A protein has these predicted regions:
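C-terminal/domain-terminus segments
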Residues: 162, 169-175
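Selective detector of the "anchor" transmembrane alpha-helix that sits immediately C-terminal
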Residues: 19, 62-69, 145-166
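Membrane-embedded alpha-helical bundles that form the substrate/pore pathway
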Residues: 54-57, 141-148
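Helix-loop junctions at the membrane-solvent interface of multi-pass transporters
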Residues: 39, 73, 107, 160-163
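Hydrophobic alpha-helical membrane-insertion segments
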Residues: 18-22, 93-109
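Interfacial loop at the N-terminal end of multi-pass membrane proteins
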Residues: 2-88, 113-137, 172-174
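Alpha-helical membrane-spanning segments of integral membrane proteins, especially the hydrophobic core
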Residues: 86-99, 138-141
């Protein structure tokens, strides 16, 4: 693979990550507060927000998965680098983002849905010290943290994908 192809793949990766981060940030910072303020029930607002977050989770899988093309293209091209260089650090951050996607969509979101289904009533009707309310609040807090950490990772990965090596370095003795 030549440098031009790698540059195009990097631009595609950055664009997808920025697109997802913008959508997630727009929802998290702008739309979710409006839902909870304007809708008559926090339960309805939470249900709608949960549906949107579920779709953003799937979009995150797509964005982060396709961003892996930047790493995969370098692997195919056998781009070499130092032991701890930008490619390895970027790859580690990318894997962390994928693990966060997995945790969110396979562990936390199903747990929140199971708690809501088990309760069968609006969350705010439960006492603050109710075991279901405590479990729901904890899962919801973890969900929010994973959501915003993935936004930060998407922005970081998009901003640094251009720093990844693009050509195979000749390994020779250094003087």
């Amino acid at each position: 693979m030549n440098e031009r192809t790698l540059r195009r793949i990097d631009l595609l990766s950055a664009a997808l990550l920025m697109l997802w981060a913008g959508a997630a940030l727009g929802f998290g910072a702008l739309m979710a507060p409006v839902l909870f303020r304007e809708l008559p029930s926090r339960d309805v607002a939470g249900h709608l927000a949960g549906l949107v977050v579920g779709r953003l989770d799937w979009a995150a899988w797509a964005a982060f998965g396709l961003a892996g093309l930047s790493w995969g293209a370098r692997w195919v091209a056998e781009v070499k680098e130092e032991l701890i260089g930008p490619l390895r650090l970027w790859s580690a951050a990318w894997l962390v983002a994928l693990l966060m996607c997995l945790a969110s969509s396979a562990v936390v979101t199903p747990k929140v849905r199971a708690i809501r289904a088990r309760i069968g009533a609006p969350i705010e009707t439960l006492a603050k010290d109710s075991p279901d309310r405590v479990a729901y609040d904890r899962a919801h807090a973890i969900s929010r943290q994973l959501f915003f950490l993935r936004i930060l990772l998407a922005l970081g990965l998009a901003g640094t994908v251009g720093l990844l090596p693009r050509r195979q370095e000749e390994s020779g003795p250094e003087a």
